[in-house]
Amino acid sequence: VKILLAVESGSRAWGFASPDSDYDVRFIYVRPKEDYLRLENVRDVIELPIDDVLDINGWDLQKTLRLLYKSNPTLFEWFSSPIVYLETDFADRFRKIMGEYFSTKKSLYHYISMAEGNYREYLKTEMVRAKKYFYVLRPVLTCRWILERGTPPPMLFRDCLLYTSPSP
């Protein structure tokens, strides 16, 4: 496969990594053209075994295009990551068309669901690590960003916090 874009996702890209944070590497790739001409389906993700340091997975270009059409918020995050490991000219061209597919409604549903899920998973226990509060606050702030600006939110927690209006 040929990698078109490789970025960091997760707490490192959000700006609140802890000493024990792993590297969440995400990438977009293209397979040999023969794979796209097959009648049977070819797996459209690559997932490497996760360990304490690395969590690496990627999406095939065809899957990426389908997800763009559906305004997948995770895809928008990957393309706005402040930590880029590899980037081809494809990434710039892709970013130029992404805005046409952004849906505030789909993004709001995604981030509200993420905040609720993270709240249930991380904050309803006796002992809560400080970092876990950020896992709830970040999607809440991204919702505020989307409501105020109508654009995809930035990856960095700091930017979501600084560039949204305070609560009345």
Predicted ranges, named:
Residues E47-R144, E148-R149, L161:
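Conserved NTP/Mg2+-binding pocket subregion across the NTase superfamily
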Residues G10-D51:
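Catalytic metal-binding acidic patch
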Residues E8-G10, N57:
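Short His-Asn-centered micro-motif
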Residues P152-L162:
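Short, charged amphipathic alpha-helical segments flanked by flexible coils
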Residues L4, Y23, F134:
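Residue-level detector of short, conserved catalytic/binding motifs and their immediate flanks
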Residues V1-V7:
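Helical scaffold of the NTase/Pol beta-like nucleotidyltransferase catalytic core
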Residues Y163-P168:
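Conserved small/polar residues in nucleotide/adenosyl-binding loops
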Residues S11-W14, R31-K33, R120, L141-T142, ...:
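Short, solvent-exposed loop/turn segments at secondary-structure junctions
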